[in-house]
């Protein structure tokens, strides 16, 4: 905050002297900080601290530190005028809340950056390992196995089973012939039984004929 370089004189009075209705001297200690157009600032400071206390404080402070002290005093008085309850304390609390909010947002942003970096590294690793994986997949396709999928997407094992079934339909296997053997054996047995019955009948006829002749 820039401070006025106004110096007291006989014709014009500073805001402090004007408020006190007294003549502003050339060496007025308050004229530098409360010029003629700084009535509101003086009223705020006077209401909070009192003009006599401000004058005593300035006299006790070194001249090189007076500007900084009055800047703080005027700022504190204006803050109390805007917020009679909180004053500067409320301003400090608001600033702390803003700092904490910004700090939290900064931490979240850093976490997002770390996450993006880790994802980028993972994608880079996958791209580096992709050719090796493709080669290994092609080598698996070239192996003589029964449980892999060919280029057309057909199951090699199913194709072999279909071919075997077609061959069985065209050329009956030994297993089918073996299944038919019981039927053939039963037919042979029946024929043998018929032959034995015929023999028995012939023998009976011969016996009967011989008995009749006798």
Curated annotation (Swiss-Prot):
Annotated ranges, domain LOB: 12-113
Pfam families: LOB
Domain of life of the native organism: Eukaryota
Family statement drawn from the similarity comment of this UniProt entry: Belongs to the LOB domain-containing protein family.
PANTHER family noted in UniProt: LOB DOMAIN-CONTAINING PROTEIN 4-RELATED, LOB DOMAIN-CONTAINING PROTEIN 7
Stated name of the protein: LOB domain-containing protein 7
Organism, scientific name: Arabidopsis thaliana
